[in-house]
């Protein structure tokens, strides 16, 4: 029988999931091996499979997306700090090479960055759900315009009174950069204290 009472159930930083099988010792060993293999894949290649707090990403996607995923979180966190009013909509534009990536993971990174200011407990999986529960519309647009950058992400937050935007790219050195804030062109490397 599944446990119905446990002190862990009351901790805010613990997520309990149902037991979905593994009724025999052999099945439990197989599940343990599968979890160990998935953790090994993540640590060695960046691949994420069946995680509760992050969208699934293949090893191939992880190699290319790593810096972009980091950038998406920085963009969200920075624009979240710029926004004091209730958010009505989050519009995310993907341009160039980034538009061909796993946009679900990048969307989650942006929204989690924005939502963490008001709710530090959100993660990449829960943030879009929390945003929708608050009535925030999330939209994405892909375009393939050739310009100065091989690819970039632009995030626009819409409130009752105004729109604010920020854009960023990943340079050839693999480092994320902010390239535009509120329509002003810049070149700034995001720091932990900034985002």
Language-model features: where?
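Rossmann-like dinucleotide-binding domain for NAD(H)/NADP(H)
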Residues: 1-82, 117
């Amino acid at each position: 029988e599944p446990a119905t009472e446990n002190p862990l159930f009351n901790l805010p930083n613990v997520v309990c999931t149902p037991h979905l099988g593994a009724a025999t010792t052999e099945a439990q060993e197989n599940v343990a091996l599968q979890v160990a293999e998935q953790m090994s894949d993540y640590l060695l290649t960046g691949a994420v499979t069946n995680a509760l707090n992050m969208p699934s990403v293949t090893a191939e996607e992880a190699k290319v997306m790593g810096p972009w995923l980091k950038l998406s979180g920085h963009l969200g966190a920075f624009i979240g700090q710029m926004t004091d009013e209730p958010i009505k909509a989050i519009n995310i534009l993907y341009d160039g090479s980034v538009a061909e990536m796993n946009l679900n993971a990048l969307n989650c990174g942006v929204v989690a960055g924005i939502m963490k200011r008001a709710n530090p407990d959100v993660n990449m999986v829960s943030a879009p759900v929390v945003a929708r529960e608050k009535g925030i519309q999330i939209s994405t647009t892909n375009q393939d315009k050739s310009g100065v950058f091989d690819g970039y992400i632009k995030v626009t937050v819409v409130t009752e009174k105004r729109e604010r935007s920020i854009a960023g790219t990943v340079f050839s050195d693999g480092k994320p950069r902010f390239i535009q804030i509120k329509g002003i062109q810049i070149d700034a490397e995001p720091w932990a204290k900034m985002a």
